[in-house]
Structure formats: structure tokens, C-alpha cells
Amino acid sequence: MKKYILGVILAMGSLSAIAGGGNSERPPSVAAGECVTFNSKLGEIGGYSWKYSNDACNETVAKGYAIGVAMHRTVNYEGGYSIQSSGIVKPGSDFIMKGGKTYKGHKKVSAGGDTPYWYK
């Protein structure tokens, strides 16, 4: 009886492996930052859009590995002022950076932020 139960368990495990069971979630073959592109036409100072031309990016979302790409950006102004914003870029949804060309009378001097990452 023990041999029979062991045989059934092994057979089920083999079928599960053949059928793609187990942890089929693999990391994407593309870095999150490669799936977004800066778009100067979004908002007053720009934003980011999904890069539809990258098949690996589209596949990453289509297969459910991630919802999209998380973005965190900081716009810096003269006088030490800054405005931060965060959002998700995904197919059909852009991320518009908060801020403008000036803030409290101070000109924008730079924009930057954290490395984009896959948002699950």
C-alpha cells in the first residue's frame, strides 16, 4: 500500500511539472526602465508613457508578472525647493510629473528620481 501511495504522489508530481505546475512566475527578460519613454507633451513638464514597441514589456504585463512600471520622480527648483510625485505607467495609463516650469517664483533646475521598477 505504501508503494502504491508513493507511486501516485510521484506520478502527480511529474504530471504537474509537465503541465507547467509549480512556480511558473519568472522574472521578466527586460528591465522596467526599458518599458517607459519620456513624453514632453504630458503635463507642463512632461511625464512617461508605455513603450508599446517593446514586445518583452508587453509580454511581462500580458502574462501577469507585473501590472506596470512604478515611477518616483523629483523636480528640483532654485532655492532648494522640490516637488515629488509617484505613479504607475502601464499600457493605456501615463504618469504625469507634478510641478511646473516654476515653483513659488523659482525656476526648475533639474528632474530625477529612483530607478523604475516592476509593480506587481
Curated annotation (Swiss-Prot):
Signal peptide boundaries: 1-19
Subcellular location(s) per record: Periplasm
Record's keyword terms, sorted: Periplasm, Signal
Induction, as annotated: Transcriptionally induced by CfaD and Rns.
GO cellular component terms attached to this protein's record: periplasmic space
InterPro entries xref list: CellEnv_BiogenAssoc_sf (IPR053764)
Main location: periplasm
Name of the protein this chain belongs to: Protein CexE
Source organism (scientific name): Escherichia coli
